[in-house]
């Protein structure tokens, strides 16, 4: 049970018209934040995170350039977030995960989200690749999402902590995403 006595629907939108001057709720808009903020392009498969949130009018097509042409693929939200027992919620740390480092040197602006068609369709079939590190002559930095929803063997931490860096415990940052981007306790 949710422990609530009732639910309420938001008021309908009523555009201001001169003849409706006495009406209530004219031009009333409901504020919202788009979350998760990470998106992926369905065409080029690149991950995209805007620097300061996304407005609904900004969503739509990928603006990455390939051979001087825009990709124009459809952007969709990535369906993974992190939350803790205290109710904090934030975007999954894609850059930290793929680099296995809580403070990666790479900026994470060239991460690719790919599905392996030869696997079952579970988390182990989703791969994140850092194309920036791969271009620098390093071995490709690539990692799948296997076990990201699992607890560690001792149930005292998460798979994220166990597989990020040795001797580093990935802790909740206290994010209160519902209050705005970058709001933490």
Where are the regions a protein language model picked out?
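Extended, Lys/Arg-rich, non-catalytic nucleic-acid recognition/anchoring regions
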Residues: 1-185
